[in-house]
Amino acid sequence: MKAIASKVTRALPVGARLQCVDNTGAREVEIISVRGYKGVRRRLAAAGVGDMVVVSVKKGTVDMRREVLNAVIVRQKKEYRRPDGLRVKFEDNAAVIVSPEGVLKGSEIRGPVAKEAADRWPSVGSAASIIV
């Protein structure tokens, strides 16, 4: 995992549902915690593009449902600003399933991937077909 230059808005709190855009068998996942989040008392942990989260699989194949896994967020609807002044937002909130070390579990990623996620997680960047 590498550091990223831009400060991404943390728009996805615990409980948010995301589309799973890889070929692991999970279709929809729910965030149950954010890795490395240091917050304030009674504040819900929130995540943004490029963050690793712990998710529960809500929809998918029978053997994947109700599994607790790690995922990396690759798209979010809430816009965020890059250091060059460009504002980026996507059509949906999406994540890909990864191992605890950050290695992609699937072999393909559907749709575009944010540059911040691809730079921070090399295995996600190498599997992405489109990097925005």
Curated annotation (Swiss-Prot):
Keyword Membrane: no
CDD domains: Ribosomal_uL14
Top-level taxon in the UniProt lineage: Archaea
One GO biological process term: translation
UniProtKB keywords: Ribonucleoprotein, Ribosomal protein, RNA-binding, rRNA-binding
SMART domains hit by this protein: Ribosomal_L14 (SM01374)
Coiled-coil annotated residue ranges, if any: none
A GO cellular-component term linked to this record: cytosolic large ribosomal subunit
Molecular function in Gene Ontology: large ribosomal subunit rRNA binding; structural constituent of ribosome
Subunit annotation: Part of the 50S ribosomal subunit. Forms a cluster with proteins L3 and L24e, part of which may contact the 16S rRNA in 2 intersubunit bridges.
Function: Binds to 23S rRNA. Forms part of two intersubunit bridges in the 70S ribosome.
Family assignment from sequence similarity: Belongs to the universal ribosomal protein uL14 family.
Stated name of the protein: Large ribosomal subunit protein uL14
